[in-house]
Amino acid sequence: MNLSSLPFRLLAAAVALCAIAAPASAERIKDLAQVGGVRGNALVGYGLVVGLDGSGDRTSQAPFTVQSLKNLLGELGVNVPANVNPQLKNVAAVAIHAELPPFAKPGQPIDITVSSIANAVSLRGGSLLMAPLKGADGQVYAMAQGNLVVGGFGAQGKDGSRVSVNIPSVGRIPNGATVERALPDVFAGSGEITLNLHQNDFTTVSRMVAAIDNSFGAGTARAVDGVTVSVRSPTDPSARIGLLARLENVELSPGDAPAKVVVNARTGTVVIGQLVRVMPAAIAHGSLTVTISENTNVSQPGAFSGGRTAVTPQSTIKATSEGSRMFKFEGGTTLDQIVRAVNEVGAAPGDLVAILEALKQAGALTAELEVI
């Protein structure tokens, strides 16, 4: 049994099972699209984590940590002479990032992620001092502070030896920031609601317009492009929310996904869509394996000969070529048939990647081949 191809066979079997033809199911608009303008916004900030057990920044290599601490102490009324550079090991300079959810209001908490930006070994047990979080416009939208939760562990010895488990230089603070400024209201002063599909598809857009018109009356919705549907709505915010509550629960059958094969060249993962078809083609695929082994020979001179012991390496190179087997795809071959044919010849994931690329180059693969 070829164990190397077993994970691929299990994956292929699972994909083939999912590809069994089934009637199209109705999906809600809220699962297919998002309301235009309703999105999160990235926040970023800089701060200091204190209280570390000797695992903080080595300040001789990260002078900005000392400078930041001096500035902080100065704001608190503690003056540190300019010619004094404390050698600290319990402080770390960190970057803070978070996402400001849509409709977040002042006073609401949000989660934050804290990451070391210098040479701290671990942030475990540290506390983040108050730091502002800014948006892309430079405005402060939240203030962050709190005790870190770190899933990893790290320690370093004086001789430079180091041990770490997971990633101890990154931590999170649940509800670690408080919103101080709200985003502008996206619903103010507009007579239309924009719906943007998660995936570009003209069929789904057309069906969405028809479903909305069927539920709310003809002319309520119009297609803008392959992603966007515009819906007429009242200008009163309360009425708009009521319309959206009904609108997002309207059901429709989305269009079929385009035929696509996605290949991860690094891991050998291959995902084949249900609608992939292959034109008539014959394929022969073999592989060449080169094995290099190294042995060491020791030559010991005779007693009292005055010679020296010599160590010589000995390399053995062996090349084996597996016999290739040819198989044939008829016109209109489906996903299930592709998987069965590849499994019969015992192809590994890497072999399947090469076969699919060759089929695409030959014009026999009627699908988009995407390599990630």
From Swiss-Prot:
Disulfide bonds: none annotated. Pfam families: FlgI. It comes from the Bacteria. Its main location: periplasm. Residues 1-26 form the signal peptide. InterPro entries: Flag_FlgI (IPR001782). GO terms for molecular function: structural molecule activity. Keywords: Bacterial flagellum, Periplasm, Signal. It is found in: Periplasm; Bacterial flagellum basal body. One of its GO terms (cellular component) is outer membrane-bounded periplasmic space. GO terms for biological process: bacterial-type flagellum-dependent cell motility. Belongs to the FlgI family. The basal body constitutes a major portion of the flagellar organelle and consists of four rings (L,P,S, and M) mounted on a central rod. PANTHER family: FLAGELLAR P-RING PERIPLASMIC PROTEIN FLGI, FLAGELLAR P-RING PROTEIN. HAMAP family: FlgI. Assembles around the rod to form the L-ring and probably protects the motor/basal body from shearing forces during rotation. This is Flagellar P-ring protein. It comes from Xanthomonas campestris pv. campestris (strain B100).
